[in-house]
Amino acid sequence: MKETNSFSQKLKQFALLFFPIFVTQMSLFAMSFFDTTMSGHASPIDLAGVAIGTSIWIPVSTGLTGILMATTPIVAQLVGSKKKEDVPHVVIQAVYLAICASFVVILIGLFTVTPILNGMRLEEPVERIAAQFLSIIAIGIIPLFTYTVLRGFIDALGKTRTTMIITLLSLPINVILNYLLIFGNFGFPKLGGVGAAIASTATYWCILIITVIIIHTKEPFASFNIFKHLYRPSLSSWKAFLKLGVPIGFAIFFETSIFAAVTLMMSNFSTTTIAAHQAAMNFASLLYMTPLSLAMAMTIAVGFEVGAKRYNNAKQYGFIGIGLALAFALLYSILLYFFDNEIASIYTTDIQVHHLAKEFLIFAILFQISDAIATPVQGALRGYKDVNVALIMTLIAYWVIGLPLGYILATYTDWAAKGYWIGLIIGLAFGATFLLIRLFQVQRKYTTQNNRS
């Protein structure tokens, strides 16, 4: 990151931040995407099992990685304020937190996964695949969480191209292992959805190893000497980190877990409905990688400018990110409307699943505008380290408005499973409105401070 003077310079620098992040997020998502699509071609039962397992795993992983994402705004503001010497301590303490969080998640999972699955009254093969999927994914928790911290450090320096290269190097491993283990090719055992979990876990370890090597040997990362001193765990540092990270993590958890909760509540419907819902939701999540990537770029850019006390520049980066997100949303809405048949065909050859997935995809169009506002706005707020109000707004919009409304529509109207999608759309719209108002308030506060000084 460097200081910019004109709007065109900001747009160029933002694009240089965004594009590698986008490729990275798409590559990471591709692991889940290939898990889902390839499992679906194994059988509808494998697809449903992976859907249930993923719906339990994703909220946990995204919530905790959200906490660890606090590394990015903290390091970005330190670099912006010329405090490079403080960066290694922050990163190492975050790594310690990542490892501790990993063991806590694994321990909790040992006692809760089986009761949760038993309580869902799934078909026996679906429950078995989901349980095995989660057991294997647990082995990849430590590398995934640790990588999240190290990636936050790399991205905060504006070197998002590096994380892009790391992920692109790892993606083929995931795809090849999926091909071998899901379908049993070249003499490997045919494991179906369980093979997808093994492939993803192995890939997480590869990503971590590559990242550690790059940070230790390549500039500008090596000059920070991140691994030179293994600092003692500092509870005061953990407290400061968690003060920022916990609201970020819970906001992300509330947002992602509502989709997972809907998938779990879909267990009352048929396996065909679960599979179709998962296919449509998976593609909607694929499109979500764009506003998410814009949000991550905004956190870096806004955090850097706030650290340097250039508040007007931070405000301009916010508008750039939201404007780009809305443009992409329009493009994706057109894509969903005209190519719903082709998109559904990616996930399944089953006629019933295909038809129902097309119906769900139409609702995904309405997600686009709300996501284009809510997600980038949260990224900008993280750059300001303003996270507590966003947490409350997200909780209300998704869990107080969206999910209860979806349940009512699904249970007491003819909308059935589609009622959940309508509830989500309304909740997302409220969330986007609340968050945008908060961003304007924060920008006004910092602009006023800047004018007074």
Curated annotation (Swiss-Prot):
Its main location: membrane. One of its GO terms (biological process) is monoatomic ion transport. GO terms for cellular component: plasma membrane. It is a multi-pass membrane protein. The chain crosses the membrane at residues 15-34, 47-69, 89-111, 132-154, 164-186, 193-215, 248-270, 283-302, 317-339, 388-410, 420-442. One of its GO terms (molecular function) is antiporter activity. It is found in: Cell membrane. Signal peptide: none annotated. Keywords: Antiport, Cell membrane, Ion transport, Membrane, Transmembrane, Transmembrane helix, Transport. NCBIfam families: matE. PANTHER family: FMN_FAD EXPORTER YEEO-RELATED, MULTIDRUG RESISTANCE PROTEIN NORM-RELATED. Belongs to the multi antimicrobial extrusion (MATE) (TC 2.A.66.1) family. Multidrug efflux pump. This is Probable multidrug resistance protein NorM. It comes from Bacillus cereus (strain ZK / E33L).
